[in-house]
Amino acid sequence: MMKKPVVIGLAVVVLAAVVAGGYWWYQSRQDNGLTLYGNVDIRTVNLSFRVGGRVESLAVDEGDAIKAGQVLGELDHKPYEIALMQAKAGVSVAQAQYDLMLAGYRDEEIAQAAAAVKQAQAAYDYEQNFYNRQQGLWKSRTISANDLENARSSRDQAQATLKSAQDKLRQYRSGNREQDIAQAKASLEQAQAQLAQAELNLQDSTLIAPSDGTLLTRAVEPGTVLNEGGTVFTVSLTRPVWVRAYVDERNLDQAQPGRKVLLYTDGRPDKPYHGQIGFVSPTAEFTPKTVETPDLRTDLVYRLRIVVTDADDALRQGMPVTVQFGDEAGHE
């Protein structure tokens, strides 16, 4: 009679174990079994000279691997070297003019200006006296009206010359005006800016690789005359390599930034790459047709950017990738 309760107890224990195991299995499938589908997303960039000119040489061809800082091509430098020399000369002239403005006038120049005033004063005094005499002769009708007018004109011209000499002496003694000094300084700064631009233009006549990558296309050949910004090369950036994938709202909580995942390709199904979620879009969108999830194409999903941490040259632009979530992704 005692065996029946024991059997019932054992059955309850077994049933509880089965239920617990099933729940654990279900949870593990929910937490670790998420699979997404995406594509390799390698960035490309068009490289060009920032200035125009005739292509002098190109150092790389399609398929070549390039390194950041590597010289890829050069334009004819001669026009930019000439422009640089002209800009340097312009700075020298502007600097000299500015220095003169700051220094003011020399004692010799002031003395010459004072002598010019004395000379102009003597000439004016003579013309004024002559005009006074002519007025007396005109009253006695000894000279004609035309003679008197000529004397007045000579007197006025001498007076204008005297005033000009006096103004010049006054300026020499007081130095250059602040406005003139400011204008000379502005001219110098403009010349310096033109020099900096000329130096930059010469530098930009050499095309430098901005980062590591692989040359996809070579659009021009030596001898081609390019406008500024014309594409010379198209480069595929080898690092970083991303995978673009999409997750629905139901599984969004599993796709958190920093989460590690495994990435499988058709070429190596038994040797996954490792990745880490770097970005999750804050807004939902319809799944693009390129993603191989027919059952989700009508759903709203969130875009993921997964950085491949052990990428190699086997990963190509657009290659389909299976993204596997699970605890093993963080341990392999």
Swiss-Prot record:
Compartments it resides in: Periplasm
Keyword Cell membrane: no
Domain of life per record: Bacteria
Keyword terms: Coiled coil, Periplasm, Signal
Coiled-coil intervals, chain numbering: 141-210
Any one GO cellular component localisation term in the record: periplasmic space
Main localization of the protein described in the UniProt heading: periplasm
Signal peptide coordinates: 1-16
InterPro entries for the chain: CusB_D23, UPF0194_membrane_YbhG, UPF0194_transport
Assigned protein family: Belongs to the UPF0194 family.
Full protein name: UPF0194 membrane protein YbhG
Source taxonomy: Bacteria, Pseudomonadati, Pseudomonadota, Gammaproteobacteria, Enterobacterales
